[in-house]
Amino acid sequence: MRLLETIGYNDKIKVIALIGAGGKTTTMYRIASCLNKIGKKVICTTTTHILKPKEKYPFPVLGTPMKDNPEKLSAVSVEDYQRICKEYDVVLVEADGAKGMYIKLPASHEPVIPKNA
C-alpha cells in the first residue's frame, strides 16, 4: 500500500478531495482500491462531474445521474453527502473538473472542496 504512504494517509483521515487537471478519477479509484484492500469501507463521489465508471469496482461510486449527459454523474445532495460521511470509513471526492484536459486554469468557483476534506 505504498500509494497510501505516499499520500500521507492515516486512520484519522475521513475525507480526501482530489483536485487539479488530469488523472483525478484514476487516482481516486486507485486510492479507493488500496483502502478497500486494507479493510476500509470506502466510497467515491464528486462535487463536480465525473464519468460513470465503465468497470465494476469493489466499492460504490455515488453521484446524481445527469439528465443532459447519461454518461456522467454530478454531485450528490448535501444530505446524501453527510450521510455517506457517517456511513463510510473514508470518502474520496473528485472536487475539481478539468474536462479531460491535462492542464487547466480554475474558474472563480473552483475547486469545490468539501469543508471536511
Task: Show where each model-derived region lies.
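A short, flexible low-complexity segment enriched in Lys/Arg and Gly/Pro that occurs
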Residues: 1-4, 74-76
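Walker A (P-loop) phosphate-binding motif
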Residues: 2-38
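Generic detector of short, locally flexible boundary/turn motifs and exposed helical patches
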Residues: 7-10, 58-60, 84-90
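Short coil/turn segments at beta-strand junctions that form active-site/ligand-binding loops
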Residues: 14, 39-41, 87-89
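General beta-strand structural signal in soluble alpha/beta enzymes
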Residues: 18-19, 42-47, 62-64, 91-97, ...
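N-terminal phosphate/diphosphate-binding loop that engages ATP/GTP or pyrophosphate donors
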Residues: 32-71
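Phosphate-binding/switch loop-helix module in NTP-utilizing enzymes
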Residues: 69-110
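Gly/Ser/Thr-rich active-site loops/lids in small-molecule metabolic enzymes
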Residues: 112-117
